């Protein structure tokens, strides 16, 4: 029976990491959305701890993805930083607001969003080009980044999930980013928001189960790297489809895990 005990967490974390890594590398999606429900459901872990572990897996996976996107010139650092500042600031406001409202999990909502967003990318790919992106004046773009950052931050803090999905949605639809740049910028911002989140979770909730923590971090990192490299080589249309498929599968999988 004992071998089972070691093997089981490895399997759970492998699939959680795979889902999270692909989600991060392809869509700039937060690992928290995938890893937390799996750890809670299969390993019976405390939800607060699970989110902490998921967020720390996010940090490295996002950093590696961001680096890969940056090398391929698919990262808007300037606006990313502007947006990040407003995201971080308003995440605090958001989580304060959330503490005033009776705690309900907004989990189902973000999963549903993931699913819908996936369908959107398959049905209606984002085909903006880099050239079209350059057409917007720097000042307008900076203001847009701040406003969107505020919105994302509030949602992040309130829902308590890395606003990876929100960010991708807002970057592609509101700011008119090209998909690769949107994902690159989204992961870049997420590296920092996840770091802040993970640190605060561990400060409040104590240290995690290091085995599970380590496995999650490593597996997520591995898959995020694979996905990011692939994403940067792919043609926009293929990438949209791949991203969409990954999101839909993840959405369905998480819903399945939650309600079974």
Feature map (PLM): residue ranges:
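Hydrophobic, membrane-facing alpha-helical anchors
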Residues: 3-9, 13, 56-67, 162-171
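Transmembrane helix boundary and interhelical junction motifs in multipass membrane proteins
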Residues: 26-35, 160-170
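A small-residue-rich subset of transmembrane alpha-helices
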Residues: 57, 185-201, 211-224
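Short, structured loop/turn "capping" segments at alpha-beta junctions
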Residues: 129-130, 161-166, 177-181
